[in-house]
């Protein structure tokens, strides 16, 4: 196998188990869809968790996978070791085979032994295994199958050889297979003091789930024991290619060579750690971006940003002064897109995000390192936590990046002080990612679902139906009935009410019978298909097993379904106009509007908006029939259906297609929502606003038909007052232009003065027009430390007009401060104004400098009452304003 590539080794593993009646199951998403408490998939068993716990069943009992995994952040965090050891990665692939109540220890050991010694051809004399100290079954099976003597089967009594899902749930002993890389490397056998060396390396872990942990002191046998195994692809590839170092495999060599060529720097012993960091972090960053995770300051996005910035800092160490990551991506695409086509589908988004993020970070990096070096001259061994926090808070240096810089200087950081400052900071609200586990409330729904089964949803074909009350809840407790004015929950055996999901809001309506009426205010789908009606009894009473009529608000439903269909058309139009990198990041489909969030790095131009609207309206005007088909997920994707990352699909999916375009559908998506029968039912469509909600994420809002007419009338009424005020000015300008009588005489002082006056007045009208546009002009008046502060964020405003708006703002607030940010052409202008009465207390120059350093600016200038600066980081506006607020306080 020494001549096999990493890709070929992956194929050999999967093919071997497929020949042995295992179903090859595609890797699940890195962002788990069955465990919201887990940050990233970190092992092969994550996607099978609910099968092992009995909450889910599939049509196979044997499976094999190559699972994408990320270990960075949370409980499993390998980030700080990457680049400095032969085996640590942030992104890796976990090969595995699984038995769900089918075969057990003997077969699992036999499959493993045959694969590694026969298919892979590994010398059995270099192999050792461990078993849990009291697992005599596994001990004896290894002797029988492998012919091992007792000294090659090592009994381990620690938790390293006993696996559990949590404090309760499935658990069992492990058996690990180790390979001896030779006595030229340091390290001892597992269980010895020097077991952590590079000589004896674990290559495969076999987990035998045979118990269920009921409580701390109680454990019972599972009726159907299962098997979960994990083998790191990069680790086995290193072994089979004759090295103990994962970074010396064919795959990493290509990535490192690509980085070397791009940077025009040769790999040496002194700089190889940096090249390894770049190769590893490019993989993790690209796969996370492909799934729609974008760099941000919280949650998964923050972990991605940490990975990206650590890698980019190492390219900077190698002499790079411009973005390089996006250029190296092409090699990763060549290497992995055949097995992971999502890389190709998202390549535009990946490259653009890598480039933009590196451009931003390089600006911050130079300034941050300068400050860090100045502070390092003042200390000997430990960097104060306050400095590390400033680097994090102002320059976007994650703590582990600062630690990585200090590592080469044999220094550390005061982590305790840093953590304390993080807790005190109100800016970044980090989510507390705990271990796996379900809340007690969730457990209620599991129990109810077990008793009642799924609810039959009839809402695709009808807006009313009869049903039987199967369960009533009041204050989260089961009761026999509900009386007048009681608030509670009703579950029926079937329902036409749509439960909130997929961005579509729930139906509302009435559940009734003679002398009883329950007003439904919300409907939620629990565990996928248990429909739960929330509401209040308006009259009468209801009890278990009553026959009732369920009727939705039809007019509201019709509006919702029209907006949902419009959302599908909008999604496809965005992809066609802006590019296939556009992926849905969120949506809200209501009865009076739609909101759609998607990945895109810059504002949409007016021309692009016109094209998008034209696409949508042209399909609506064609009066195309909307077609619904039921398929397997694989068939749906083969038919061009657009599936959404993070969505969980069953064995059959609902495929919605609409819009006839030269014999093909304009839009095809997997969707469980309600939709129009014909696109004509949508009515006229228009985008009314766009905004940025996060770095790389845009939001558009749109209206249709009656709501659009109402909106336009309201906007017209709002503008009439301003138009009346401006009308006199416009007429005066027209009169003055006529007086010029054609081409002006620039030698005539009166005409030159008139031209300047015209320009001034036109500029004034331009400013007034922007102020009227609520979509471009966001104003937030606050009181800080007893003073009025106006925070204003404006899109498309020429920076030269900032002074005018500051003056207008100061007039409006009377006494206080005005802080205005203007975004134009992906750059940001900042202006600060201080009213006359406060000039002795506040200095506009100091305030503008506090804000400009965060948005990538270089100081700023002006006077005590007005100062202005520019920057290159518009996504940092909120943080910049927070910095200003601190100074004011």
UniProtKB/Swiss-Prot annotation:
Entry GO terms, CC: cytosol
Signal peptide as annotated in the record: none
InterPro entries xref list: aa-tRNA-synth_II/BPL/LPL, Ala-tRNA-lgiase_IIc, Ala-tRNA-ligase_IIc_anticod-bd, Ala-tRNA-synth_IIc_core, Ala-tRNA-synth_IIc_N, Ala-tRNA_ligase, Ala_tRNA_ligase_euk/bac, DHHA1_dom
Transmembrane segments: none
Top-level taxonomy: Bacteria, Pseudomonadati, Pseudomonadota, Alphaproteobacteria, Candidatus Pelagibacterales
The organism of origin for this protein: Pelagibacter ubique (strain HTCC1062)
Compartment(s) of residence: Cytoplasm
Name of the protein this chain belongs to: Alanine--tRNA ligase
Keyword Zinc: yes
Keywords for this protein: Aminoacyl-tRNA synthetase, ATP-binding, Cytoplasm, Ligase, Metal-binding, Nucleotide-binding, Protein biosynthesis, RNA-binding, tRNA-binding, Zinc
Biological processes per GO annotation: alanyl-tRNA aminoacylation; negative regulation of DNA-templated transcription
Cofactor descriptive note: Binds 1 zinc ion per subunit.
